[in-house]
């Protein structure tokens, strides 16, 4: 799965129905990240008015266990499930490592999106796990 500062190649794939299980949207441009996330959400799950197939977390207080549990839960009524972790760079080192360890086991029907406020460090265990997921 790509971790991208430039969302255009990702968006082109979404139009064709090509999705990855994990995305890392990083960089200081909050507007571009949010617009990219909203486009992914619209393409991936479409209309989910009750929010039954969407979960959100804040990296400042999220645990890897809770994120992975949500990301591992199959969607209601078939379909797809979207999980977002905003400010993912705020996860502690221990939580980051646990999250990285669990990425490979996510169901194909689900998509985990990590929103990173700064440029992501490519040496990070989590960034490397996202790239290989």
Task: Give short role names for the model-derived ranges.
Residues 1-133:
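Conserved beta/loop motifs at nucleotide-recognition and modification sites
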């Amino acid at each position: 799965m790509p971790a991208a500062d430039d969302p255009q190649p990702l968006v082109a794939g979404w139009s064709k129905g090509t999705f990855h299980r994990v995305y890392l949207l990083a960089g200081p441009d909050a507007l571009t990240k949010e617009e990219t996330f909203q486009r992914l959400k619209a393409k991936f799950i479409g209309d989910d008015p009750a929010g039954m197939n969407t979960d959100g977390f804040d990296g400042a207080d999220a645990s890897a266990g809770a994120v992975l549990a949500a990301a591992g839960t199959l969607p209601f009524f078939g379909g797809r499930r979207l999980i977002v972790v905003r400010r993912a760079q705020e996860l502690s080192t221990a939580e980051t490592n646990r999250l990285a360890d669990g990425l490979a086991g996510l169901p194909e029907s689900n998509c985990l999106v990590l929103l990173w406020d700064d440029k992501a460090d490519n040496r990070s265990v989590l960034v490397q796990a996202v790239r290989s997921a």
